[in-house]
Amino acid sequence: MKRKKIAIVGSGFTGQGTALFAAARDLGDIVLVDLPARENYAKGVALDMMEAMPVYGSDTRLVGTSDYAEIAGADVVVITAGVPRKPGMSREDLVNTNAGIVKDVAEKVARYAPDSVIIVLTNPVDSMTYVALKASGFPKNRVIGQSGVLDTARFRTFLANAIGCSFQDVVGCVLGGHGDDMVPLVRYTSAGGIPVEKLLPKETIDAIVERTRKGGGEIVNLMGTSAGYAPGMALVEMIDAILNDRKRILPSIAYLEGEYGYTDMCLGVMTVLGGGGLEKVIELDLTDEEKVALDKGAQGVRNLIEMLKAGILAQ
């Protein structure tokens, strides 16, 4: 049986985390792609990880390269390449530089791995997913952004610590843009089947919601750069769902054509991920307050997309 193949563009912190977690699960062989100036680094990272596999018990083969021809036949291509956030920077500060990078990568993916599913992580990820979709020419089910799995994981972490329960018992839901305007939906969040509103006081939940929104910035302020392990694990959750056709209900950034009243934009919503990529958008019933919050985040994403449509996507 032919092994699955995963290509990861960008061998930085998040690319490494994604590769290591995917290799540990033996999801498929992995190609780490980076710039020519970083090719030896990517080769070294891949070799170091591969030498760990006999001890770990995985048969994953890894290679590092700067040659996009090496991604031929990839089932999933993850785009992590881009300029990382530094303290004081917003994701939006990165938009012009990273849009050029993502556009170039997506065009190469379309050339060398035309049947793959693209998962975008590069920030600001909602608008970068839109760039990848347009630059690749892929159908909307094969270009997905990662934000909600990570944001929900942070939400679950903070809630579980406050409740004093297992992380695994907390089921959460975060919609909207990947930034300060994301919308953690407390109504759809529970621990062991019990609504979290029955387990924690409102002020505690409100503080956790705010910490979740600032979760990425908290890591940046502590480490001086973006997170790597949690985003990598979130990506692997999505990769696994696609490669193994698991039909997982996961929050993902999807191209919307009328859902929630939004058109021609990419935004974090609940989705079904399986062998066909993003197979379905699940549209939740929202309260007026929740919809207003979602609209606020969507407008920020819309503004960036319109800027990109008038700029780099018009070239």
UniProtKB/Swiss-Prot annotation:
Active-site residues, record numbering mapped to chain: 178
Superkingdom, taxonomy of origin: Bacteria
UniProt family annotation: Belongs to the LDH/MDH superfamily. MDH type 3 family.
Protein's organism: Symbiobacterium thermophilum (strain DSM 24528 / JCM 14929 / IAM 14863 / T)
Coiled-coil residue windows: none
Keyword Oxidoreductase: yes
Protein name: Malate dehydrogenase
GO biological process, one term: tricarboxylic acid cycle
